Amino acid sequence: MTTPLLGQSAEELRIWVESQGQPAYRAQQLHRWLYQRGVRSLMEITDWPKAWREQVHSVPVGRSQVVRQSAAADGTIKYLLAGADGETVETVGIPAAERLTVCVSSQVGCPMACRFCATGQSGFARNLGVHEIVDQVLTVQEGFGRRVSHVVFMGMGEPLLNLGAVVQALRVLNGDIGIGQRQITVSTVGVPGQIRRLGTYKLQITLAVSLHAPNQDLRLKLIPTAQHYPIEELLEDCRDYVETTNRRVSFEYTLLAGINDEPHHARELAAILRGFQSHVNLIPYNPIEGVEYERPGEARVRAFERELVRHKIAASVRHTRGLEEAAACGQLRRRSLSGEAQSASTRA
């Protein structure tokens, strides 16, 4: 199958256009139609000769199909997108007064199987291609009728298990769509060796590490794959990342009532992060059907935050968006084309 055009750089598009016997300026036209106008078929490119459009009409652009979308009261919109093979992912547009953020997925499902995450309970099918990642941003721009300003890789999947496609997508989002690297965040639960590998690209993105526990024993209960990546090794790799990129690391910490939200957990977390160039994002657990964890009360959440700050750790509580439409952090799922949620034992 021909590689989709979406996700290719300006130089790659020039090479393709010239390989078709066309002048280089046609690549500039193609670039504009792909990344500014969001074309879905080459037949739509009206400033190309009709004869050539007909000649290349079967070359895939790489746009996904919007199967359904649902809006929350706060303006958040969740999209269910289907790829060419029928596999689906969810992506979320999160509007604010002066910004529009897209929460993008990097895989169909997720193999990390975190106990408190809906995606982790829905099984894993495959990695997304560069075009499928970039398409999510274009879809949200089209849906909201405004430019996307921020991108967070916090949707379905573990980005560092699809690092090649993610890095190429980052370059397209930055260089071809015009989103600043510092407005892009990549979240990871941690994959041995991959944080250091990401650091070698010297990108100015924000790395967000899903920690969720202050010690290895508790983290292993919440994140089964932590058995391959001791928390001490994870933190050492994060320190290396800070030194290599001169960018601080954000640590994500989902607060689960009675599990990891006690004052002693906050003190233990402060101890392991002391001296770290970092920030802690506290995320009150967003309920998932069939999972026994509970969301702590507001007072408990604020007490945890105060304890971290008291120990000189920069911390803040993330405001939940899209909760009633299951579009909040940890709530995205693999689904069938009908919108039915998938589990690890079912296939779309």
From Swiss-Prot:
| Co-factor binding details | Binds 1 [4Fe-4S] cluster. The cluster is coordinated with 3 cysteines and an exchangeable S-adenosyl-L-methionine.
For the ligand (S-adenosyl-L-methionine), the binding residues are 157-158, 187, 210-212, 286
PROSITE patterns, per this entry?
Answer: RADICAL_SAM
Family to which the UniProt record says this protein belongs: Belongs to the radical SAM superfamily. RlmN family.
Query: Is Metal-binding one of the keywords?
Result: yes
Catalyzed reactions: adenosine(2503) in 23S rRNA + 2 reduced [2Fe-2S]-[ferredoxin] + 2 S-adenosyl-L-methionine = 2-methyladenosine(2503) in 23S rRNA + 5'-deoxyadenosine + L-methionine + 2 oxidized [2Fe-2S]-[ferredoxin] + S-adenosyl-L-homocysteine; adenosine(37) in tRNA + 2 reduced [2Fe-2S]-[ferredoxin] + 2 S-adenosyl-L-methionine = 2-methyladenosine(37) in tRNA + 5'-deoxyadenosine + L-methionine + 2 oxidized [2Fe-2S]-[ferredoxin] + S-adenosyl-L-homocysteine
Instruction: Identify this protein by name.
Output: Probable dual-specificity RNA methyltransferase RlmN
What's a GO biological-process term for it?
Answer: rRNA base methylation
Q: Name one Pfam family in it.
A: Radical_SAM
